[in-house]
Amino acid sequence: MVPLLESETENSISQSQFDSESASAEPTPPQHTQESLQNRLEEYHERLSRLQLPSSSDSECSDIEQESLELEQEVPLSTSVYLAGARSAGGLPSSSELSETPEPPKVAIRFQPIGSVGQVMPQVCRISSAQSFGAVLVFLRRRLRLDTVHCYVSNSFAPTPQQNVGQLWEQFKVNDELVVSYCATVAFG
């Protein structure tokens, strides 16, 4: 038998007594049955409130609030090529305007080996500023033919693969180059 909480044990005993009394007794008037049903509902309500479960109306309210917050957030027109062109020209941009979207500028990355890892040739490479640092990791793994490569920006920290190369370059460039040191094992910390 599955162990029950104290209140459940008491309620199950009273429930079995109620069932046995109702089966052996004469039919009760509808008012008495309605009162006992009301009492049982109140008991269940108390037990549920002790569990502190969110009611369905609470979850519906939170869902509605989240949807209204999402709808209230405005999306800037600059995020869409179509909307930005429609705002400036008063209509949809032509296909020639769409093909003329400027490519992000390229940034220079200088690779410096740490320890006994070989030098990557060329030492300075250019990459699109919109690329993630994960692309740099893939490039180094292929060039060095290693399974794992640990990279450090300016010998100080290891960037995450999701970080943007352009942002790293803007913040940590030295002589207009992002200095990336690399090694086969963990070098710092």
UniProtKB/Swiss-Prot annotation:
Similarity field: Belongs to the ATG12 family.
Ranges of biased composition (kind: Acidic residues): 60-72
Keyword terms of this UniProt record: Autophagy, Isopeptide bond, Membrane, Protein transport, Transport, Ubl conjugation pathway
Chain residue numbers at which the record places covalent cross-link Glycyl lysine isopeptide (Gly-Lys) (interchain with K-149 in ATG5): G189
Gene that encodes the chain: ATG12
Subunit text: Forms a conjugate with ATG5.
Localisation: Preautophagosomal structure membrane
Its job: Ubiquitin-like protein involved in cytoplasm to vacuole transport (Cvt), autophagy vesicles formation, mitophagy, and nucleophagy. Conjugation with ATG5 through a ubiquitin-like conjugating system involving also ATG7 as an E1-like activating enzyme and ATG10 as an E2-like conjugating enzyme, is essential for its function. The ATG12-ATG5 conjugate functions as an E3-like enzyme which is required for lipidation of ATG8 and ATG8 association to the vesicle membranes.
Protein name stated in the entry: Ubiquitin-like protein ATG12
Biased composition annotated in UniProt, kind: Polar residues: 10-39
Any one Gene Ontology BP term: protein transport
GO function terms (MF aspect): protein tag activity
Composition-biased stretches (Basic and acidic residues): 40-49
Lineage, highest ranks first: Eukaryota, Fungi, Dikarya, Ascomycota, Saccharomycotina
Membrane protein topology class: Peripheral membrane protein
Matching Pfam families: APG12 (PF04110)
Region annotated Disordered, chain positions: 1-72
Cellular component, GO annotation: Atg12-Atg5-Atg16 complex; autophagosome membrane; phagophore assembly site membrane
